[in-house]
Each structure stands twice: as structure tokens, then as C-alpha cells.
Amino acid sequence: MRPLLVFVLMVSVSLAFSLEGMPNNGGDSVASITANQARRFKRNPLFSFAQHSLVDLKARACPYYCSSQIRCCLGFKCKDVDGTLKCVSKGDFLGK
């Protein structure tokens, strides 16, 4: 029980520090956001977990943007929309 508590505290502290310095990159591309995160959290042992937590999220906690490191949720596909890779539903993906 104690190791689980330590792990949960470590993750919450790591995420708190990582979200604190995150600028608003609304217009930036996914590649530049990922590159900024890589530089900022390079030494973080929980980097891969933090990386997925820092992407823009939809209401169902699915990533809005996708890349080679960030995968879409089940039922969504990664598609180039206006030069940006975004997760779209399979129905939208097949329709266009």
C-alpha cells in the first residue's frame, strides 16, 4: 500500500510542476508543442506520461492532436486537417 501511495504522490507532483509552466500554445503545431515539451521535461522520469497529459483533450479525455508519439482513442483516426494532425471519428474520416 505504501509504494502505491508514493507513486501516486510522485505522479501528482510531477504533473503539477509540468502544467504550471505550460504556455498557451493554441495556434502552434503539434510538432512544436511536442518539441517544447521534450526540452522542458527531458529529465522527468515520467515524461511519456506527462506528454500525454499535456495535449489538448476532448470531453472524453481523448487527445485532440495526434503524432507518432500521441495516439488517438479507439474509434478515432489521425488525419491531416488544414496542415495539422487531428484525431477525428471514423465516420468523419470515411466521409471525406
Curated annotation (Swiss-Prot):
Expressed by the venom duct. Keywords: Cleavage on pair of basic residues, Disulfide bond, Secreted, Signal, Toxin. One of its GO terms (molecular function) is toxin activity. Residues 1-21 form the signal peptide. GO terms for cellular component: extracellular region. It comes from the Eukaryota. The cysteine framework is VI/VII (C-C-CC-C-C). Has the PXY motif between the first and the second Cys residues. This is Teretoxin Tan6.14. It comes from Terebra anilis (Auger snail).
